[in-house]
Amino acid sequence: MDGDIRHNSYDDGSEDVLTGEQSIRNFNINFGPQHPAAHGVLRMVLELDGEIVERADPHIGLLHRGTEKLMESRTYLQNTPYFDRLDYVAPMNQEHAWCLAIEKLTGTAVPRRASIIRVLFSEIGRILNHLLNVTTQAMDVGALTPPLWGFEEREKLMIFYERACGARLHANYFRPGGVHQDLPPDLIDDIEIWAKAFPQVLDDIEGLLTENRIFKQRNADICIITEAEIEKWGYSGVMVRGSGLAWDLRRAQPYECYDEFDFKVAVGKNGDCYDRYLVRMAEMRESTKIILQACAKLRAPDGQGDILARGKLTPPKRAEMKTSMEALIHHFKLYTEGFKVPAGEVYAAVEAPKGEFGVYLVADGTNKPYRAKIRAPGYAHLQSIDAVAKGHQLADVSAIIGTMDVVFGEIDR
């Protein structure tokens, strides 16, 4: 050190401050992969100018398992469980798209009872998804009670999954040609009892969040999506409906027997995080109505009957296998070799909870798909994070990821 404290022999930058030539460098930080608000294994490199996000660079692929390639070496039936492992928050909705694609190519008509059961469990999946999304988004912005309440309700729905097919999460319940097995009458009764009580739970969650000052401040006017951006980025689902466009595949291109059900399509006005939260809450109420209608239809005389389109795609009844040699051979061939699908290509899409989940299937006439392209909504949503997060504060990034509703099973595949 020099003797005179007033004259530095080293450059401490104080001269630059006087001349105004100090260069301020932007700050790069890693958001994730172990960040609690990253919803899985998202790694994002954020470039910050103070608190403001200048650039958001998502690094995906940490959960990549090569699903689409693996599917090319499995039979059509063996591929169904892969779909449970994509969006593992609401598994049955993904299986639905795969089964619809196979049924389109083979021209299989699904029995009415199976169709109603599919609708019932698709809507249960929608509630499973939205409950998790709404409550974890509340947790991301600082509320701790909603996730506890939300998980309590999800647990009840998981038990319905388990009672229908034996598995809580990876169900493998939807099959090409119908569903794996029929629902017992007391399960239908219990689902109906639950659906009648559920709106009260939604009221409780809304009481905590909807008019909560902090929740509003953290979500209102954050990540506003315009109509032009929707077309540019390929948004679907709540990301579209939150901006005031009533686009819902259950209405626009009805599949299964959705055209028989009475429900409204919830839309927002402002296209921000808060509106998307409100849309998800409204959708859960509409799904509850659909569940109650489905329970009534399953009890009606025209809702009775078989739950599988008996033929080459589906196994024979257990009783037939005990008496008929042909049935036993058919069962053995189906589960070893699998069924063949006529050559062709088809795109089947369903309104999954996160958006339009589609399967583009190319068949070559064998028992395995030639190529299956999975169109996951979360992938299309996450690609736009740089565009929508730019200019927001660092604290808003977790709200934006929460409102996009990303799950890495389906993004990385």
From Swiss-Prot:
Keyword set, alphabetical order: Cell inner membrane, Cell membrane, Membrane, NAD, Quinone, Translocase, Transport, Ubiquinone
Protein name from the UniProt record: NADH-quinone oxidoreductase subunit D
InterPro entries: NADH_Q_OxRdtase_suD (IPR001135), NADH_UbQ_OxRdtase_49kDa_CS (IPR014029), NDH1_su_D/H (IPR022885), NiFe-Hase_large (IPR029014)
Reaction(s) the record says it catalyses: a quinone + NADH + 5 H(+)(in) = a quinol + NAD(+) + 4 H(+)(out)
Membrane disposition: Peripheral membrane protein
NAD is among the record's keywords: yes
Highest taxon of source: Bacteria
Alphabetized Gene3D superfamilies for the sequence: Cytochrome-c3 Hydrogenase, chain B (1.10.645.10)
A GO cellular component entry from the record: plasma membrane
Keyword DNA-binding among UniProt keywords: no
Family: Belongs to the complex I 49 kDa subunit family.
MF terms in GO: NAD binding; NADH:ubiquinone reductase (non-electrogenic) activity; quinone binding
Localization per Swiss-Prot or TrEMBL: Cell inner membrane
First-level EC class: translocase
Function: NDH-1 shuttles electrons from NADH, via FMN and iron-sulfur (Fe-S) centers, to quinones in the respiratory chain. The immediate electron acceptor for the enzyme in this species is believed to be ubiquinone. Couples the redox reaction to proton translocation (for every two electrons transferred, four hydrogen ions are translocated across the cytoplasmic membrane), and thus conserves the redox energy in a proton gradient.
Species this chain originates from: Rhodobacter capsulatus
Enzyme Commission number(s): 7.1.1.-
SUBUNIT field: NDH-1 is composed of 14 different subunits. Subunits NuoB, C, D, E, F, and G constitute the peripheral sector of the complex.
